[in-house]
A protein has these predicted regions:
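An anionic, turn-rich surface loop/hairpin at beta-sheet edges
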Residues: 95-117
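His/acidic/aromatic-lined binding-pocket segments of jelly-roll/cupin-type domains
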Residues: 70, 77-80, 112-113, 120-121
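A short hydrophobic beta-strand segment most commonly corresponding to one strand
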Residues: 136-149
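Conserved metal-binding segment of the jelly-roll/cupin
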Residues: 114-134
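Short hydrophobic/aromatic-rich beta-strand segments that constitute the beta-sheet cores
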Residues: 60, 88-90, 140
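Bacterial N-terminal signal peptides
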Residues: 2-14
C-alpha cells in the first residue's frame, strides 16, 4: 500500500509539472520575407530576428555592404554562413579616425579569413570582428550569448 501511495503521489506531482515553453519557429519563407521587409529601412545590414533577450540574441543577418568593426564585451558569437562570401577580420585593434562615424571603423593587425556558405565561426567574448570585402550579399545565422564567468 505504501508503494502504491508513493507511486500515486509521484504521478500527481508529475502531472502538475508545467510543460516547457513552446519552441520558437520561423519557416524559411518567413526568414526571407522578414529580411526583404527590413532591407527597406536598413539596406546595408538588416536582420530577421528569431529571438532576442537580455542574455542572448538569435538573428539571421544580411549584409550588402561592409559595416564598421565592432566588439561585444561579455558576449560570445557563433556565425553560420547561409549564403555569400566575404572576408572576416578578427582580433587586432579597432581603428576609427577622430570624428568619423562608428560604421567607418576598421581593424589593424587582425587575422583575415575568407568565409563562404557552410562555414561556422566562433567569436570569443569581446573579440574585435569586421566583415569586409563582401562579394555580393552575405547572409548568416548569428547566435550571440552571454559569457558564463
Amino acid at each position: 500500500v505504501r508503494t502504491a501511495i508513493a507511486v500515486l503521489i509521484g504521478l500527481l506531482s508529475a502531472a502538475q509539472t508545467p510543460a516547457p515553453a513552446p519552441s520558437t519557429y520561423l519557416s524559411d519563407g518567413e526568414v526571407w520575407a522578414t529580411l526583404k521587409e527590413t532591407a527597406k529601412t536598413a539596406p546595408d545590414m538588416h536582420t530577421a530576428p528569431v529571438k532576442n533577450t537580455d542574455h542572448y540574441r538569435i538573428n539571421v543577418v544580411q549584409r550588402t555592404k561592409p559595416q564598421g568593426a565592432i566588439a561585444h564585451p561579455g558576449f560570445i558569437e557563433v556565425h553560420h554562413i547561409i549564403e555569400g562570401t566575404g572576408t572576416l577580420v578578427t582580433g587586432g585593434s579597432i581603428i576609427r579616425p577622430e570624428g568619423a562615424p562608428a560604421g567607418s571603423a576598421t581593424i589593424d593587425g587582425g587575422v583575415s579569413r575568407r568565409v563562404a556558405k557552410g562555414d561556422v565561426v566562433l567569436i570569443p567574448a569581446g573579440a574585435r570582428h569586421w566583415y569586409k570585402d563582401l562579394e555580393g550579399t552575405l547572409t548568416y545565422l548569428e547566435v550571440r550569448f552571454e559569457e558564463v564567468k
